[in-house]
Amino acid sequence: MDKKPLIEIKNLVKKFGTFTALNGVSLVVYPGEVHALLGDNGAGTSTLIKVLSGVHPMTSGEIKVDGEIVNFTTPRQASDAGIGTVYQDLALNALTSVTRNFFLGRELIKGPSGFGLMQMDEMDRITTEEMSKIGINIANPNQPVGTMSGGQRQTLAIARAIYFGAKILILDEPTSALGQKQQMEVLKTIKKVQRLGNIAIILITHNEIHARLIADRYTFLSLGEVIGSGLSSELGNEDVKRLMAGGAKIGDLAKELEQ
């Protein structure tokens, strides 16, 4: 492959006291690709997100972003390095406008610091334009976010992360708690971001069907360790099902249910 990875993780270990949450995790994520990170509850995906996002410092290992070794100790450091994380709660205020949620503390101000006025027309224009780039045309950027569908709110959070500099986009179960139509909206948004070609996407999901639809690569975690990885073209449906089950064979699981 000619492309260089945007993020490289080698032998990442994270311990909480005597408990090892991540044990020697390695993976690479390339621009223009969706890298699905799959695992059951307790697999370590949430801990990995928090390490990459600067919430938890790693215990040992190496993380490179765009070829540079990093060691995040705060979320701001991760954000400044170009890592944008969209959590399940989205960090949106349902009662305020789409535009205010898009900027959320980074408003465009004209005039002296502390006395300036927000440039609402320009902020509305940017919000509408950035949402449109990844597939959502909003009629009124001043509508409350609470009037948007779940899929549209996900798109808003993704567009916001990209506009403010994310080159590595981490999506934490973006289709969970959504209806089927809204799930497809979100998957279409992710595909549009992928087609931009310059953003690496880490998709955390428990839904193997969604992963099969949009992922280019997979990494499977179980109990904090990588139990399998590969290109989507290399892994068949049975491989994915087996690795989603923690490496167990489907037949063995069926026998266990009969006991």
Language-model features and meaning:
Residues 2-259:
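Glycine-rich phosphate-binding loops of nucleotide-dependent enzymes
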